[in-house]
């Protein structure tokens, strides 16, 4: 078997041509074996010798990456970008890939290229086409030297005790309580949520001193800031961020620091700093005569003594719950922060000012405060709704399904309307009999009135049937919307991962998969059994009918049972059973609604 065909770069082809010219007595087959290429490929290279050497001279260093002369659809943009890149490199300033993308977007805007997105794929191809090895080398070095991350330990109820904290204290809420139910009784502006995230602020100084360490590997940022973000449910109050770092507290300028800052050896928000933060919040709420609820996300691993808090109630999210602010708010803050750093880097590079690449701690704090202020209140409120607070999934369950009292009231109203219609019908029949006794023209008029009344009654019956169909279809749509909301919020039913779904045979059966034929056979058998049951019910006149509850009634009952069960301290095994049951109910409902829709479609066609 001959060597496998592969596409060579212009530099590799040039080396082959050079080898042939330096060894005229060497057989072509031997040279082909030396470079592990087929003899036909060697013949093609020698045939296009002049064009290959010209391309190597044209692309220079990039010839080590380029394999063809194919031009990019953004050739003009890349020409301007590579000229700017070479100018910056000539000044001795390194450029990272993210700055190349930002500069490319600016050039595209100037050229009117609205379809250009500066994707990672384009950046990789740009580096290969133009030999931007310094930037791509960082990525390759990181890929070689990075070690695989250990799997994260599952979140558990254990907490790190703090100094002076003696176990459970008054005012604590257990982690088993669901935050949406805990927030009941609080106004939207009095429900706060806090989470901690990390930012790097030596990104620019890393560029100024070079991207490579002494051992030739890419250096990583070492100055990390831990940022505590806190906002209320409607987004009307965004508390000043609490920032923690390793550097000592900087001297405040004339205007003071834009946010609170604390320093420690690990650069994280410590228990003492968090206790001080909560104490200040409690004092503020006392001055405003307010009692607020504070939901903690990643702070659940810290043990706090909340006995001194009178106006702040602290609650924790259950393990595995996605924090409201982590549904897009934290990502926005990081995006605004990085954008501010990029603008500073671009200004320094275009001005060829290496000192402008240095980012101090005070300036980083200003960037954090500005990024937090740039988040819109509407975005915060949306993230809370997606987490189940006010109009989220829980609100959909409680509002889309009617209670038993409401259903009884509706049934009584329908019965009263039917009685009124029957009374009106009896009066009309008496009038018709009087008209018939008059005879002659009265009989003809009475017959016409009877025809009109029969038409009206048939129209009313059709309207009632249409209303019943609309109610059943709307109930089905509400159930499907609720199920779809569960999927969009958690990535799966009941918060299951792909591995957990694969391990559940019940869910695999409900989803169909490879057993679709057997499912259809079982559906046909179920239909035959249902028909037999209906015949048995008709024959058995004395038998009592058992009413089948609707999906709304079933889910309302299930929600009641779930709330009752989760009000007790239950272990993970029981919680898993509840989630599996919820998962199965949603799947069965979706399958049933799809079957009903198919039956209705067949009925319309017939």
UniProtKB/Swiss-Prot annotation:
<feature type="region of interest" description="Disordered">
    <location>
        <begin position="138"/>
        <end position="184"/>
    </location>
</feature>
<feature type="compositionally biased region" description="Acidic residues">
    <location>
        <begin position="405"/>
        <end position="480"/>
    </location>
</feature>
<dbReference type="GO" id="GO:0000775">
    <property type="term" value="C:chromosome, centromeric region"/>
</dbReference>
<comment type="function">
    <text>Interacts with centromeric heterochromatin in chromosomes and binds to a specific 17 bp subset of alphoid satellite DNA, called the CENP-B box. May organize arrays of centromere satellite DNA into a higher-order structure which then directs centromere formation and kinetochore assembly in mammalian chromosomes.</text>
</comment>
<keyword id="KW-0013">ADP-ribosylation</keyword>
<dbReference type="Pfam" id="PF09026">
    <property type="entry name" value="CENP-B_dimeris"/>
</dbReference>
<dbReference type="GO" id="GO:0003682">
    <property type="term" value="F:chromatin binding"/>
</dbReference>
<protein>
    <recommendedName>
        <fullName>Major centromere autoantigen B</fullName>
    </recommendedName>
</protein>
<feature type="modified residue" description="N,N,N-trimethylglycine">
    <location>
        <position position="2"/>
    </location>
</feature>
<dbReference type="Pfam" id="PF04218">
    <property type="entry name" value="CENP-B_N"/>
</dbReference>
<comment type="subunit">
    <text>Antiparallel homodimer. Interacts with CENPT. Identified in a centromere complex containing histones H2A, H2B and H4, and at least CENPA, CENPB, CENPC, CENPT, CENPN, HJURP, SUPT16H, SSRP1 and RSF1.</text>
</comment>
<dbReference type="Pfam" id="PF03221">
    <property type="entry name" value="HTH_Tnp_Tc5"/>
</dbReference>
<feature type="region of interest" description="Disordered">
    <location>
        <begin position="392"/>
        <end position="480"/>
    </location>
</feature>
<keyword id="KW-1017">Isopeptide bond</keyword>
<dbReference type="InterPro" id="IPR015115">
    <property type="entry name" value="CenpB_C"/>
</dbReference>
<dbReference type="InterPro" id="IPR006600">
    <property type="entry name" value="HTH_CenpB_DNA-bd_dom"/>
</dbReference>
<dbReference type="Pfam" id="PF03184">
    <property type="entry name" value="DDE_1"/>
</dbReference>
<feature type="modified residue" description="Phosphothreonine">
    <location>
        <position position="398"/>
    </location>
</feature>
<feature type="DNA-binding region" description="H-T-H motif">
    <location>
        <begin position="28"/>
        <end position="48"/>
    </location>
</feature>
<feature type="compositionally biased region" description="Low complexity">
    <location>
        <begin position="144"/>
        <end position="163"/>
    </location>
</feature>
<dbReference type="InterPro" id="IPR009057">
    <property type="entry name" value="Homeodomain-like_sf"/>
</dbReference>
<keyword id="KW-0238">DNA-binding</keyword>
<feature type="region of interest" description="Disordered">
    <location>
        <begin position="504"/>
        <end position="549"/>
    </location>
</feature>
<keyword id="KW-0832">Ubl conjugation</keyword>
<feature type="cross-link" description="Glycyl lysine isopeptide (Lys-Gly) (interchain with G-Cter in SUMO2)">
    <location>
        <position position="246"/>
    </location>
</feature>
<keyword id="KW-0539">Nucleus</keyword>
<dbReference type="InterPro" id="IPR034882">
    <property type="entry name" value="Dimerisation_CENP-B_sf"/>
</dbReference>
<keyword id="KW-0158">Chromosome</keyword>
<feature type="domain" description="HTH CENPB-type">
    <location>
        <begin position="65"/>
        <end position="136"/>
    </location>
</feature>
<dbReference type="InterPro" id="IPR007889">
    <property type="entry name" value="HTH_Psq"/>
</dbReference>
<dbReference type="InterPro" id="IPR004875">
    <property type="entry name" value="DDE_SF_endonuclease_dom"/>
</dbReference>
<dbReference type="GO" id="GO:0005634">
    <property type="term" value="C:nucleus"/>
</dbReference>
<feature type="domain" description="HTH psq-type">
    <location>
        <begin position="2"/>
        <end position="52"/>
    </location>
</feature>
<dbReference type="InterPro" id="IPR050863">
    <property type="entry name" value="CenT-Element_Derived"/>
</dbReference>
<feature type="compositionally biased region" description="Acidic residues">
    <location>
        <begin position="512"/>
        <end position="545"/>
    </location>
</feature>
<keyword id="KW-0488">Methylation</keyword>
<feature type="modified residue" description="Phosphoserine">
    <location>
        <position position="165"/>
    </location>
</feature>
<feature type="modified residue" description="Phosphothreonine">
    <location>
        <position position="396"/>
    </location>
</feature>
<keyword id="KW-0137">Centromere</keyword>
<dbReference type="GO" id="GO:0003677">
    <property type="term" value="F:DNA binding"/>
</dbReference>
<keyword id="KW-0597">Phosphoprotein</keyword>
<feature type="DNA-binding region" description="H-T-H motif">
    <location>
        <begin position="97"/>
        <end position="129"/>
    </location>
</feature>
